[in-house]
Amino acid sequence: MRLSRTFLATLLLSPLVPIAARAQDLGIDVGAKAPAVSVQSLDGKRVSLGDYIGKTPMLIEFWATWCPNCKELMPTLLDAEKKFGKQVKFVAIAVAINQSPEKVRRWLAAHPLPHDTFYDVEGKAAGAFDAPATSYVVVLDKTGKVVYTGLGGKQDLEGAIRKAL
């Protein structure tokens, strides 16, 4: 009976191995040139990420007010911004899933952030960066090349930023 339980567990879990291995490969390719897509400011004005890309190293986080991984990542993100904020442009892109610009504005009023926050109304930025989920971080070097992508509440943002400097 013991062998059959082990066999059954292996059989049930083996399809998950490729998914776990592929998790690090999700998103825009490291080495790719970042797309200069447009997003919106929280007051509805069109903003092109191309205005920032290629001018200075940049950290972009795709996030949501309701995302637990984003909340877990926030202290690490703020520490990195405090340390590297004069050298790196930090940008948050709020995804348009279960939140509105108004909800994001209310959240930011209660939890002020030191960096620019934009809204991805049509999901074009998330699509262009192939963002697999919220808490997805992309770090660009000063030429606009992707040097890091990561997902989840525990990321080495300081190490990622050092790759861009």
Regions found by a protein language model. Give the residues of each.
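Short, acidic, Ser/Thr-enriched surface-loop or helix-capping motifs
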Residues: 28, 41-42, 140-141
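Structural microenvironment flanking redox-active thiols in thiol-disulfide oxidoreductases
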Residues: 71-111, 121-128
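A short beta-strand-turn-helix
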Residues: 37-58
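Short pre-active-site segment immediately N-terminal to redox-active cysteine/selenocysteine motifs
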Residues: 56-58, 62-66, 133
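Thiol/disulfide oxidoreductase modules built on the thioredoxin-like
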Residues: 54, 107-114, 120-164
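Hydrophobic beta-strand anchors of alpha/beta hydrolase catalytic cores
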Residues: 59-60, 90, 137
